[in-house]
């Protein structure tokens, strides 16, 4: 959520900044309501001052044994008027808050201006795509032929875009999760948390999924609960409505979770295989930092996610998202895209974002430099470290062999106890 003072004092700057996102924002209603609210607050303060003056006069008259009936009636009338005005102010503040919740974050000045993903800017590449001496297969073909992925039964049991992992496929998924968590906790300094997979609406509001993206979420019928679309939601809200000790910042957390996304409008090739599932596993990285360090922390976060792919030996590239492709809550985002031979292209496997104080304002996460200091909003960051299903897909495709087997990346062998996946 944007700072209401920034919107009030510099509406033209906010509108122009959000135009770069492709958002045609009209702040007329917001500014009208804000002006009405401020006038009402002045009126309230004047009436409270008058009520206090009348109250003092009533006290003076009573001490002298003089009647004060008329003044008592006047004070009651003033109290009724103040209550009515307070109710009006509360209603207007509710409307202002609702409008603020729909306004996306302002892009950082370093974000390239562009209309959509075609104008994202490549930053760097790592590794060379493998040159096969045979025609490589897609991961869904490999998984079915090795009998380690069962899409048909997943569809039968639940519906489209649900999958059973079987045998060494299930073991590979688990190995990837454990490898990522071990790397981030032992080498990158993250503290692991294991969060709830169900959160309330306040948590979804805090990270920016609600109200804008309600149709992409799975809501539990009859309850104010949602299945999490990412561990970002519960882990960020871990400190909702708290004031943190500035000496304890930065705070780094990593978390494994299942993720659930309705994505009603999703279509095309990505809905085949493991690329775009309704349920998938992910290891998430979340940071709470001081504002002056947040962009340095974004670079570190991105490098931490990249390290997973480097150790797995998977070619990838990093792109910075342009303004038109930027997520609702993000001020700046790097996407890490892994090479998938079946696409003959790079596919997103991680998004690493700095939200600045956008989520912290919504979730009321602040910190104090010292006990007597004024609380300030933290900056929050998060990134996938990584999406597990897409990592498995990349391993199957990049490490496939002509005989139909798949070589297990060296760093995963201690977790699996095998160096190759064969059909049994």
From Swiss-Prot:
Task performed by this protein: Catalyzes the attachment of serine to tRNA(Ser). Is also able to aminoacylate tRNA(Sec) with serine, to form the misacylated tRNA L-seryl-tRNA(Sec), which will be further converted into selenocysteinyl-tRNA(Sec).
Could you identify this protein by its name? Serine--tRNA ligase
UniProt lists the family membership as follows: Belongs to the class-II aminoacyl-tRNA synthetase family. Type-1 seryl-tRNA synthetase subfamily.
Which UniProt keywords are present, listed alphabetically? Aminoacyl-tRNA synthetase, ATP-binding, Cytoplasm, Ligase, Nucleotide-binding, Protein biosynthesis
Per UniProt, L-serine binds at 230-232, 284, 384
Give the UniProt record's GO annotations in the biological process aspect.
selenocysteine biosynthetic process; seryl-tRNA aminoacylation
Q: Which gene encodes it?
A: serS
- Give the comment on domains: Consists of two distinct domains, a catalytic core and a N-terminal extension that is involved in tRNA binding.
Q: Which GO terms describe its cellular component?
A: cytoplasm
Protein localization: Cytoplasm
Lineage: superkingdom:
Bacteria
Question: Which positions are annotated as binding ATP?
Answer: 261-263, 348-351
Q: In which pathway does it act?
A: Aminoacyl-tRNA biosynthesis; selenocysteinyl-tRNA(Sec) biosynthesis; L-seryl-tRNA(Sec) from L-serine and tRNA(Sec): step 1/1
Q: Name one Pfam family in it.
A: Seryl_tRNA_N
Q: How does it assemble?
A: Homodimer. The tRNA molecule binds across the dimer.
What reactions does this protein catalyze?
tRNA(Ser) + L-serine + ATP = L-seryl-tRNA(Ser) + AMP + diphosphate + H(+); tRNA(Sec) + L-serine + ATP = L-seryl-tRNA(Sec) + AMP + diphosphate + H(+)
Q: What is its EC number?
A: 6.1.1.11
Give the enzyme class.
ligase
Mind listing the GO molecular function terms for this protein? ATP binding; catalytic activity, acting on a protein; serine-tRNA ligase activity; transferase activity
Organism name: Carboxydothermus hydrogenoformans (strain ATCC BAA-161 / DSM 6008 / Z-2901)
The UniProt entry lists the main location of this chain as cytoplasm
